[in-house]
Amino acid sequence: KTKSYMANIMAMPEVFFQLEVSNFMYGHNARYSSPIPTEKDWDNTDYKKAYDLFKERFADASDFEFFFVGNVTDEQMKTFSEKYLASLPALNRKETFKDTGFRGKDGVHKKEVFKGNDDKATVRISYAGETTYSVKENLAMQALGEILTIKLIEELREKEGGVYGAGARGSLNKLPYGSYSFSISYPTNPASADK
C-alpha cells in the first residue's frame, strides 16, 4: 500500500523535481538526498534492522531534548512530565554526531528537469558553502530570506506578472560542520524561466 502511495507521490512533477535536484546536489548520497523511498528502496528494506535500530535509539532517553508548546500550567506540566517522561529509560549515554566529511557540490551548476505535461516551469537558484556558525548570522540569513521573498513577489509577480509566487530562504547550520544555504525558488511559465 505504501509503495503505491509513494509511486503516486513520485509521479508529481514538483516532487520529482525536488528529488532530482537533491540527487544532483548531493550525488545520490543516502544521508543527504531526498527521504522519498523508491520502489527498489522498499524492496531492499531490512525491516528487522530498522526495528532493531528503533529499539536501540529509544532505549535511552537520557540525552533527549523535549520541547513543550501549549497553554499548560506549571502543575499540569509537572504531572505530564512525571507521567510521560519520568518512566522513559535512561542509560546516561551522551549522544554525539560524526562528520563523515561529505560535502555537497560547490561552484556554479545548471540542471534541467523535465516531467509532466503542464506548461509550467520551476526555477531554483541555490547557494551553499562552509562558514562559521553564529546565532546572530543565522537570524540575519533567515531575515534576508523573508525580505527577499517580499521583494521577489513585488517585482516578479506584481510588476512583471511572470511568476505565480516566489520565495527565498536562508539558514546557517552548526552541525555536522558550519555551513550556509540560501535558495530562491519560483514557479513560472517555461518562456520566463531563463529571464
Question: What positions do the PLM features span?
Answer:
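Short helix/loop capping segments that flank catalytic or ligand/cofactor-binding pockets
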Residues: Q76-M77, P89, Y133-K136
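Non-catalytic, conformational "gating/processing" segments within enzyme and secreted inhibitor domains
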Residues: K48-Y84
